[in-house]
Amino acid sequence: MQMVINEMKQKAIYPGTFDPVTNGHIDIITRASTIFPELIVAVASNKNKRPYLSWETRISLLEESVGHLTGVRVVGFDNLLIDFVLEQSAGIILRGLRAVSDFEYEFQLAGMNRKLSKKVETLFLTPAEHLMYISSTLVREIAALNGDISQFVPPNVVRELKKRQNEI
């Protein structure tokens, strides 16, 4: 039993909508890939929200952005996060915290996930200091007003958002 638990703790899930993926997300993924032998970046379909980018596009942008990292896989999911984590035989949910304002929501989420399964722990990482203010929402707003987002997102995301703006 102990070996199974240890194996589960070797695999982490970093879930999010990544709408779009930002350099803050990339920083967390890159650093987490050096901590965990296996990291699954789990892209939520988020049927309750109206995502700016399609689920397939978000997955593709992430694969292009982190595909070079050893031990990192990008997978879409559309079920309850804790169920997805257990299906993947993972023992860690990795979450990013940018500011104190993120903490309250993330604390509640971690508590709920622990209540749903005691086999899974939630760990938090903060992005590098110069990336803490970046959010997908702010990136979308800047892009919608034709602002320069190149310092906030990977180049493939810049191209995708420009393409999207030209279609509108």
Swiss-Prot record:
Work out whether the entry's keyword set contains Lipoprotein.
no
Question: Which residues carry the site feature described as Transition state stabilizer?
Answer: 25
SUPFAM superfamilies for this protein: Nucleotidylyl transferase
Q: List the catalytic activities from the record.
A: (R)-4'-phosphopantetheine + ATP + H(+) = 3'-dephospho-CoA + diphosphate
Concerning InterPro entries, the annotation shows: Cyt_trans-like, PPAT, Rossmann-like_a/b/a_fold
Q: Which cofactor does it need?
A: Mg(2+)
Compartments, as annotated in UniProt: Cytoplasm
Which keywords does the record carry?
ATP-binding, Coenzyme A biosynthesis, Cytoplasm, Magnesium, Nucleotide-binding, Nucleotidyltransferase, Transferase
The keyword Kinase is assigned to this record: no
Q: From which domain of life does this come?
A: Bacteria
Q: Which Gene3D superfamilies match?
A: HUPs
Q: One biological process GO term for this chain?
A: coenzyme A biosynthetic process
Q: Which EC class is this protein assigned?
A: transferase
Sum up the protein's function in the record's words: Reversibly transfers an adenylyl group from ATP to 4'-phosphopantetheine, yielding dephospho-CoA (dPCoA) and pyrophosphate.
Record protein name field: Phosphopantetheine adenylyltransferase
Naturally occurring in which organism (per UniProt): Legionella pneumophila (strain Paris)
The gene coding this protein: coaD
